[in-house]
Amino acid sequence: MLLLILWRLVTACSILLGLYMLYFGAVALFGFKKRRAVPRTAPKTRFACVAAARNEEAVIANLVHSLRRQNYPPELFDIIVAPNNCTDGTARAAQAAGAMLYAPQGEIHSKGDVLREVVENVVLAGGYDAMCVFDADNLVHPDFLARMNDAVCAGHVAVQGFRDSKNPEQSAISGCYSICYWMLNRFYNSARSALGLSALVNGSGFTATAGLLRELGGWNTVTMTEDYEFSAQCALTGHRVAFQPEAVIYDE
């Protein structure tokens, strides 16, 4: 009797998993559908470009320099680096490269804790229209902010950019990460976007408008996967995460 019950449970789980994979596969096919580009718009959006950084002295300046080379009016964006729990010269390197610094006041256990303070004390208090989030080891394409401006001006309140790899051939690990990024872009975010469904915020290179952040009561993630949690919060409040493949960042 026990073996029969276990067999039925395994069978049921296998059927459910198979149905999920069938659904995922059907949706993924739409990743090959040609999509219309977001209309180009004159620069209007004032961005806060935010990066939480812990012991990132070796790479943080590269991020800041790539942001300073944006094809976007410099008066319409600020670069804010929030060093936290550092034992190296991250703050000094970021400031020397041209970033503004924000020193978190509370106890920091995760990236979400940093974003909570930055959103409350900088993004919303500073009158920015939107926040772009980056990781300290990212490089940002020169047209990133211009293309995010297009998406925001088109009415999107949460936007995930195209997360690419800057070192796919360096090692087996970096190669696997690169394949993961490419598959996520093509078979998940691009496919779901083609169907009018919500994309997935994945780590960095994403934008959230100040209006959305106010509606959510600030940044309120509590898990270590703050990107997925934020995506869920958007879905629960009826907001779709858009995908903007023309806004490109390069991750390490």
What are these regions (language model features)?
Residues 1-43, 96:
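N-terminal membrane-anchoring/stem segments of glycan-assembly enzymes
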Residues 45-48, 78, 229:
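Cell-envelope/extracellular polymer assembly enzymes that use nucleotide-activated donors
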Residues 61, 87-95, 143:
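Acidic helix N-cap motif at the loop->helix transition within catalytic regions
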Residues 65-76:
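Short, acidic, metal-binding catalytic loop of nucleotide-sugar glycosyltransferases
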Residues 83-91, 106-108, 139:
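A conserved acidic beta->alpha catalytic loop
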Residues 103, 110-114, 118-126, 142-223:
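Long helical/loop segments within the catalytic core of UDP-sugar-dependent glycosyltransferases
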Residues 125-139:
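Short beta-strand-to-loop acidic/aromatic patch adjacent to the donor-nucleotide binding site
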Residues 222, 231-249:
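Catalytic donor-sugar/metal-binding loop of nucleotide-sugar-dependent glycosyltransferases
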